[in-house]
């Protein structure tokens, strides 16, 4: 019985019926002959050829090649689509309009035809190129006669008169302040949040000490006046003394806009200039700077020094307290570093433990070989 079963031929599975194969082939042919499958196999735009017709709606048809040309024309950068000083430059497979303006930071404000105040005329031209809209200079100086805040490169909000009526209830809100017209007492509101900044005390031009530079900006916004940072660290008793004196009328000279007759390029509000030669050596470990808006000199101390003349050593700079956001990154980096160190230590320990075992095994084998040779010689 076992031999007969072993010699029995293997039986292959029965072939599918002929009718099943015919039905399957018919269904496949019918599926490929549907209009949807034909449309999916054709290239976009229909026709399949370069000169085919594309449906144009309402029974009309247009040439697909003409449609492709029209679509490509939209992406062409030329003089009509890149005006006001723009230059067409290659950007990957296409062209884009680039506004390459190297504007200086001198504060020579101008009022644009869109009602925005720009830092200087170069920023105005750059805004016109960026938005591809004509913006002209309608007045030298800010758009407000009382020196509104102005934007370095603001958005278009209509004409200057419309902007003036829009903020007429609050007046000009400077130093990132916003007008709150819905409040009972309409005025400028400051929404500067300094909660996420670390402790880094500074001395400001108003003679007050602040926990960090963000609070200086907040105070400038609340008081609506220019407040600059003199130096790092707390203010001292001599920080309120003006080095260059005052004008003849006894009032501190705080110009808001550069005089047209003054042609010096380094005269602008809110920036620092090098100190005159008579103040050489004023800063011991730092750089002397003259604040034109306050007519006072200040020192920008080097790292590790503080004081009015940068004569004191600041040991607090060695202990930097990171902010909340940076603290999480520091913790993650510390954990990753600890894991890497642990892996390296584990690998080194495994290698150092494995090597002595191998040496011991080799020594035992050598000793065993000597022992067998000695015993064999004795037996002989």
Swiss-Prot record:
Subcellular location(s) per record: Cell membrane
Topological region Cytoplasmic: 352-380
EGF-like domain ranges (all copies): 271-311
Expression sites (tissue/organ): Expressed predominantly in brain, and at lower levels in heart, placenta and skeletal muscle. Down-regulated in brain tumors as compared to control brain tissues.
Topology within the bilayer: Single-pass type I membrane protein
Molecular function terms from GO: receptor ligand inhibitor activity
Pathological association: Encephalopathy, acute, infection-induced, herpes-specific (IIAE). A rare complication of human herpesvirus 1 (HHV-1) infection, occurring in only a small minority of HHV-1 infected individuals. It is characterized by hemorrhagic necrosis of parts of the temporal and frontal lobes. Onset is over several days and involves fever, headache, seizures, stupor, and often coma, frequently with a fatal outcome. Disease susceptibility is associated with variants affecting the gene represented in this entry.
Function field: Neuron-specific restriction factor that prevents herpes simplex virus 1 (HHV-1) infection in the brain by blocking viral entry. Also able to restrict herpes simplex virus 2 (HHV-2) infection, although to a lesser extent. Acts by preventing the association between the viral glycoprotein D (gD) and its cell surface receptor NECTIN1, thereby inhibiting fusion of the virus and the cell membrane. Also able to prevent the association between the viral glycoprotein B (gB) and MYH9/NMMHC-IIA and MYH10/NMMHC-IIB receptors. May be a tumor suppressor in brain cancers.
The protein, known as: Tomoregulin-1
């Amino acid at each position: 019985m076992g031999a007969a079963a072993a010699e029995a031929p293997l039986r292959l599975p029965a072939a599918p019926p002929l009718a099943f194969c015919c039905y399957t082939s018919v269904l496949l042919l019918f599926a490929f002959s549907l209009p949807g499958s034909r449309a999916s196999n054709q290239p976009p735009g229909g026709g399949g050829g370069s000169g085919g017709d594309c449906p144009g709606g309402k029974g009309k048809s247009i040439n697909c090649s003409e449609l492709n040309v029209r679509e490509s024309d939209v992406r062409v950068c030329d003089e009509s689509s890149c005006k006001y000083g723009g230059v067409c430059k290659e950007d990957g497979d296409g062209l884009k309009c680039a506004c390459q303006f190297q504007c200086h930071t001198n504060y020579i404000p101008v009022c644009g035809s869109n009602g925005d105040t720009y830092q200087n005329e170069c920023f105005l031209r750059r805004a016109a190129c960026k938005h591809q809209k004509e913006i002209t200079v309608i007045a030298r100086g800010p758009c407000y006669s009382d020196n509104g805040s102005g934007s370095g490169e603001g958005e278009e909000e209509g004409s200057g008169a419309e902007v003036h009526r829009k903020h007429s209830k609050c007046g000009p809100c400077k130093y990132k302040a916003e007008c709150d017209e819905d409040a009972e007492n309409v005025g400028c509101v400051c929404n500067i949040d300094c909660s996420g900044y670390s402790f880094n005390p500074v001395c400001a031009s108003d003679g007050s000490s602040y926990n960090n530079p963000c609070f200086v900006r907040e105070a400038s916004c609340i008081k609506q006046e220019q407040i600059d940072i003199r130096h790092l660290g707390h203010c001292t008793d001599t920080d309120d003394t003006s080095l260059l004196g005052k004008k003849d009328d006894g009032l501190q000279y705080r110009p808001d806009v550069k005089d047209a007759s003054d042609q010096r390029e380094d005269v602008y509000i809110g920036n620092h200039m090098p100190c005159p030669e008579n103040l050489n050596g004023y800063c011991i470990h730092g750089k002397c700077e003259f604040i034109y808006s306050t007519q006072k000199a200040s020192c920008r101390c080097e790292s590790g020094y503080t004081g009015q003349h940068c004569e004191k050593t600041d040991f607090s700079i060695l202990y930097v307290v990171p902010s909340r956001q940076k603290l999480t990154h520091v913790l993650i980096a510390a954990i990753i570093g600890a894991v890497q160190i642990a892996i390296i230590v584990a690998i080194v320990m495994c290698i150092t433990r494995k090597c002595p075992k191998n040496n011991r095994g080799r020594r035992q084998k050598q000793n065993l070989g000597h022992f067998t040779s000695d015993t064999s010689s004795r037996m002989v």
